[in-house]
Design a protein with these regions (language model features):
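Conserved class I S-adenosyl-L-methionine
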Residues: 1-49, 64, 68, 100
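Short, glycine-/aromatic-enriched active-site segment of Class I SAM-dependent methyltransferases
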Residues: 159-174
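Core SAM-dependent methyltransferase catalytic element
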Residues: 191, 198-216
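A conserved beta-strand element that flanks and buttresses the S-adenosyl-L-methionine
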Residues: 127
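Conserved beta-strand signature within the Rossmann-like core of class I S-adenosyl-L-methionine
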Residues: 152-159
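Class I SAM-dependent methyltransferase SAM/SAH-binding core
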Residues: 56-58, 62-115
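Short alpha-helix
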Residues: 174-189
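A short glycine-rich, Lys/Arg-flanked "PGG" loop and its adjoining helix->strand segment in the class I
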Residues: 138-150
């Protein structure tokens, strides 16, 4: 496990804002059962990776999705957890001390989703939740597609239109993308394997969907 600083100035304002609210962000998603919902999703939809896979959590925040990946994947993989907010990355790194035995599987990096510090076609899986809403959608998906190997996968958890989605936009200062635009931009590089609506009785179902797509 290591901590690497590779931030760029682009979108620095978003990173600075999250530096200030990292604790609020972490508390919000822990209270609403986000982690449990991810566990249930991964149990029903096993991730398409094998031993030694190279995985990126793009926009990892305080590490909730990173932890869900570690719980879902029982064999050794290499995960990079990247976020623009240094405070969030440090919080995510510290939280992993409560996951003994898996620390070596994760590298924490402060960096920019629009300028990823990875070679072309070098990753097997990219997961992202709550990050593409801060960047032009086409630019974000283009950059994620650049680093995913042919046959690799993208798991995207976009915000879908809802009153809760509007509230989250105001609270966390992002702008969600229309579902049709998300689908169209994704299909420029990927074949959509499935789209999933989280159950409405789960808090995550009020604002998020899941899209798994394979690079063609």
């Amino acid at each position: 496990m290591e901590y690497v600083l590779t931030a760029t100035k682009t979108k620095a304002r978003a990173g600075s804002y999250y530096d200030r609210i990292a604790r609020l962000y972490d508390l919000t998603f822990k209270v609403n059962g986000y982690g449990r919902s991810l566990d249930q999703y991964f149990a029903a939809h096993p991730l398409p990776v094998t031993r030694g896979a190279k995985i990126l959590d793009a926009g990892c925040g305080t590490g909730l999705l990173t932890h869900a990946l570690l719980r879902a994947i029982r064999f050794p993989v290499s995960i990079t957890a990247l976020d623009l907010s240094q405070t969030s990355v440090v919080a995510a790194r510290k939280s992993l001390y409560y996951s003994p035995g898996r620390k070596r599987d994760v590298t924490f990096t402060q960096g920019n989703l629009l300028c990823l510090p990875f070679a072309d076609e070098s990753l097997d899986l990219v997961v992202t939740s709550g990050a593409l809403e801060y960047v032009p959608l086409a630019d974000g998906i283009n950059e994620l597609a650049r680093v995913i190997a042919p046959g690799g996968h993208l798991l995207h958890l976009p915000i879908h239109p809802s009153l809760i989605g509007v509230f989250l936009e105001i609270l966390f200062r992002f702008k969600s993308h229309p579902p049709r635009e998300v689908k169209d931009k994704t299909e420029r590089h990927f074949r959509i394997v499935h789209q999933y609506r989280f159950p409405r009785q789960q808090a995550i179902g009020w604002s998020k969907t899941a899209i798994l797509a394979q690079k063609v």
